[in-house]
Amino acid sequence: MTQAKDVALIFELSKQGRVGHSLPNLDIEEQPLESLLPEAYVREEEPELPEVSELQIMRHYTALSKRNHGVDSGFYPLGSCTMKYNPKINEDIARLPGLVHVHPYQPEEQVQGSLKMLYSLQTALAEITGMDEVTLQPAAGAHGEWTGLMMIRAYHEANGDKKRTKVVVPDSAHGTNPASATVAGFESVTVRTNEAGLVDLDHLREVVNEETAALMLTNPNTLGLFEADIQEMADIIHRAGGKLYYDGANSNAILGIARPGDMGFDVVHLNLHKTFTGPHGGGGPGSGPVGVKKELVPFLPKPVLVNDDGFFRFDSDRPQSIGRVKPYYGNYGINLRAYTYIRTMGPDGLRQVSENAVLNANYMMRRLESYYDLPYAQHCKHEFVLSGKRQKKLGVRTLDIAKRLLDFGYHPPTIYFPLNVEECMMIEPTETESKETLDEFIEAMIQIAKEAEESPELVQEAPHHTVIKRLDETLAARKPILRYEMKKETV
């Protein structure tokens, strides 16, 4: 019997002349392709596509699907990624014919239902975040970051303040923060984290000056800790003339409990594909709406979706706008799923989401703190970090622990991030997991900790039960093979 590890590439299954699908005979006169397309668009040779049967295709991709791990197949505690369950009612709504069969180029009067839905989503997100207006254009979180920073840049330039070229970013921040700042034309400046895992206010005062355009923060931060001094940080940045930017990657911890706008943030982006259950992974699609306070509204990407006395339309008469940042108006399908989720949960339900996410994370942290080092002992929010320093002294690295978890059927947590925690493991259980699931994962982690003491080679050589063992990750990163060269069959 063929084992899963022997699954061939789809190209390797190809057999010349094998047919997967056939088309009916033409009932009109056949036209040469050259008469239908300009010569520049006609291939000189047929594309080298695999020739396989429908049955082969089904078996091939079914076999591959069994090698995938997703939220629907098991616990996925990937820190800072909010791998929560995506309710299937979202998919039902997203497949309604009246919503599926619209086109962005249809006249506005023909798609009032869809535009009303998008406008209602904007309004809901503005209320949830404490912002004045929201754009749904950005396609993902980093895209939202860049969009927000471009608006901040436009704001400063409109005020003749072109010397503001620096964005302050904590040393525990997501890597997208300094990257987005660079792409937006800023220089990133790092502010230290103190011993409590929070922004060092004294150092923040040192690095903020008349060249500071913005401070980018997640709250809770990437260590899963709430920045309790956030309003003082807002005062520091605002007194210097800068803006406070909220990276909404960790919004799952504060829904219905706290709003960035009330903390002093001027710009917010959200990840609808995370917090609001648009499915994510595999490269997208995502959705990264951006909300702003009133003084930044003129710089929103255009067109701006507005409610004109009950008629929903796109307004392009925005002379100070940073311009369009995406074709059409955002990723419609993900926005629709997020709207469905918000309407399904309601205000009380969204608050319960965050309460349960925080409860689950704290429960796991307290159960595991006796077996792994806990860098920050205070209560966490939606996620927490452990350190494998104790196991490293026994010859077992955090990478080994992550690989060993695969043998138990779990996707490992995020490892070696944030960078300011040695042998870091970042765990985010989300609110959708039961106590039974959490307990099973905890027991696996405890067993691995004991194995590190009693039989470290068992962990060092893991995984033992997966189809693929350890990869040469350096070779894969430096010399990836991203295309298949088909071999010509000889007759």
UniProtKB/Swiss-Prot annotation:
What reaction does this catalyse? N(6)-[(R)-lipoyl]-L-lysyl-[glycine-cleavage complex H protein] + glycine + H(+) = N(6)-[(R)-S(8)-aminomethyldihydrolipoyl]-L-lysyl-[glycine-cleavage complex H protein] + CO2
Chain positions found as N6-(pyridoxal phosphate)lysine:
K274
Q: Which domain of life is it from?
A: Bacteria
Q: Name one GO biological process term.
A: glycine decarboxylation via glycine cleavage system
Oxidoreductase found in the keyword field: yes
Q: Which GO terms describe its cellular component?
A: cytosol; glycine cleavage complex
EC numbers listed for it are 1.4.4.2
* Molecular function terms from GO: glycine binding; glycine dehydrogenase (decarboxylating) activity; pyridoxal phosphate binding
Q: Which cofactor does it need?
A: pyridoxal 5'-phosphate
Alphabetically ordered keywords of this record: Oxidoreductase, Pyridoxal phosphate
What does this protein do, in the record's words? The glycine cleavage system catalyzes the degradation of glycine. The P protein binds the alpha-amino group of glycine through its pyridoxal phosphate cofactor; CO(2) is released and the remaining methylamine moiety is then transferred to the lipoamide cofactor of the H protein.
What the entry lists under HAMAP family is as follows:
GcvPB (MF_00713)
| Protein family per UniProt | Belongs to the GcvP family. C-terminal subunit subfamily.
Quaternary state and interactors: The glycine cleavage system is composed of four proteins: P, T, L and H. In this organism, the P 'protein' is a heterodimer of two subunits.
- Any idea what this protein is called? Probable glycine dehydrogenase (decarboxylating) subunit 2
